[in-house]
């Protein structure tokens, strides 16, 4: 699974997933399914915000790469993928600026058009079951929930899907591609089945001492509005590279 993740996802996403697992004391060489799940979730969050801007009239607009209007304000602030300290700093800054209610748990995105935090879910199970789990955990009507599955299903708070159909279809296509690529390598069943995952985890624990620790580079993200907090984590060239890789999943 680890080899698949490194081949299928952009190196910047892999790097962020490595950092996240290290922050929580998890070993990606043992918990490979979690490694794959984190990378998938990160990519969906990036794709959710991709190309979406707000124009001078405060309306949402979709801008393709290379368009001179790309200097418009980003519609979504990406919170997922930051270290916890920086993530809460961003959340606090958003709340102070917009008057939004501070969430109990770290959300994944903030939507400047709808003025709400968004929790993104990617599930291998039934979307309605995962949605209810998220809702019961968050216990806040202020945070919008949007769940995607690998089968093309989705569920959102009050059936408000936030994005246009084409943007959501791009996310669903990517998830379906990941599922197909996993299946072609015989990885999908273990990714879906908790029992098989536990068996793989137990097997990995026995060989834990043989696993070399993975060096992790710290990589941070922030929007132009928060440049006073720290430098931009990614310039336009790196952003373009990341976007161009979204639908690529090379085979072995």
Curated annotation (Swiss-Prot):
Which residues act catalytically here?
A: 80, 108
Q: Which UniProt keywords apply?
A: Decay of host mRNAs by virus, Eukaryotic host gene expression shutoff by virus, Host cytoplasm, Host gene expression shutoff by virus, Host mRNA suppression by virus, Host nucleus, Host-virus interaction
* InterPro entries listed in its UniProt record: PA/PA-X, PA/PA-X_sf
Chief localisation class: host cell
Output the superkingdom of the source species. Viruses
Q: Which GO molecular function entries does the Swiss-Prot or TrEMBL record give?
A: RNA binding
A biological process (GO) of this protein is:
viral RNA genome replication
* Residues with site note (Important for efficient shutoff activity and nuclear localization): 195, 198-199
Q: Which Pfam families match?
A: Flu_PA (PF00603)
Q: What is known of its domains?
A: The probable endonuclease active site in the N-terminus and the basic amino acid cluster in the C-terminus are important for the shutoff activity. The C-terminus acts as a nuclear localization signal. The C-terminus is recruited to host protein complexes involved in nuclear Pol II RNA processing.
- The molecule here is called Protein PA-X
Natural source organism: Influenza A virus (strain A/Henry/1936 H1N1)
């Amino acid at each position: 699974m680890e080899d698949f993740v490194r081949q299928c996802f952009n190196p910047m996403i892999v790097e962020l997933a490595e950092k996240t697992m290290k922050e929580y004391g998890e070993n990606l060489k043992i918990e490979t399914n979690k490694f794959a799940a984190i990378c998938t979730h990160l990519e969906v969050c990036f794709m959710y915000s991709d190309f979406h801007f707000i124009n001078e009239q405060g309306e949402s607009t979709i801008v393709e790469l290379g368009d001179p209007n790309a200097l418009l304000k980003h519609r979504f602030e990406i919170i997922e993928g930051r270290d916890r300290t920086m993530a809460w700093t961003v959340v606090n800054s958003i709340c102070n600026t917009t008057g939004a209610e501070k969430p109990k748990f770290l959300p994944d995105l903030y939507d400047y058009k709808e003025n709400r935090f968004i929790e993104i879910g990617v599930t291998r199970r039934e979307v309605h079951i995962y949605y209810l789990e998220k809702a019961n955990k968050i216990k806040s009507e202020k945070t919008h929930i949007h769940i995607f599955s690998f089968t093309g299903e989705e569920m959102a708070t009050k059936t408000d899907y936030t994005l246009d159909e084409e943007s959501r279809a791009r996310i669903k296509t990517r998830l379906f591609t990941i599922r197909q690529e996993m299946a072609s390598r015989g990885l999908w069943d273990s990714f879906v089945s908790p029992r098989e995952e536990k068996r793989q985890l137990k097997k990995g624990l026995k060989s834990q001492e043989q696993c070399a620790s993975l060096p992790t580079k710290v990589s941070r993200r922030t929007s132009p509005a928060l440049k006073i907090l720290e430098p931009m984590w990614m310039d336009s060239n790196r952003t373009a590279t990341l976007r161009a890789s979204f639908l690529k999943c090379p085979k072995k």
